[in-house]
């Protein structure tokens, strides 16, 4: 699986998730929530004590819901519309830590390490960033 974040522009960033079969692409807003920061927190919690975390991908006013779940050493990422009548799944992939979590982690790390402070995206929460780095390092063992 590949998880990539494009260049942020005026509070919007392109999110692309691909694998050998599927492609999910959407431009996500940082209003009302910073989904990149929320994803960073979700990874930290998922690797330390949670079994499932959800992150809202805001399209103003619509949204997608990204769920990342863990069952033993199998991780699953799902993108859907949340609690809707249709329950349509727009993207889903499962795999081990290297196949699901590392692509997300590397993309988040790259996003924050390469940002320019002039761009219109909230600054990284250094404590949450450090928590994510430590959680991944501990899990990798």
Q: Residue spans of the language-model regions?
A:
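Short linear motifs in intrinsically disordered
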Residues: 1-8, 42-47
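N-terminal intrinsically disordered, low-complexity segments enriched in P/E/S/T
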Residues: 7-12, 139-140
């Amino acid at each position: 699986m590949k998880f990539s974040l494009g260049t942020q522009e005026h509070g919007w960033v392109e999110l692309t998730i691909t694998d050998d079969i599927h492609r999910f692409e959407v431009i996500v807003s940082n209003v009302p929530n910073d989904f990149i920061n929320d994803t960073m927190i979700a990874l930290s919690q998922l690797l330390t004590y949670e079994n499932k975390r959800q992150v809202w991908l805001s399209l103003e006013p619509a949204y997608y819901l990204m769920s990342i779940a863990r069952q033993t050493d199998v991780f699953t990422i799902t993108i859907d519309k949340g609690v809707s009548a249709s329950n349509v799944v727009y993207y889903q992939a499962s795999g081990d830590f290297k196949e699901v979590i590392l692509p997300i982690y590397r993309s988040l790390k790259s996003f924050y390490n390469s940002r320019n402070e002039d761009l219109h995206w909230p600054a990284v929460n250094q404590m949450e960033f450090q928590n994510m780095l430590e959680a991944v390092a501990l899990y990798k063992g």
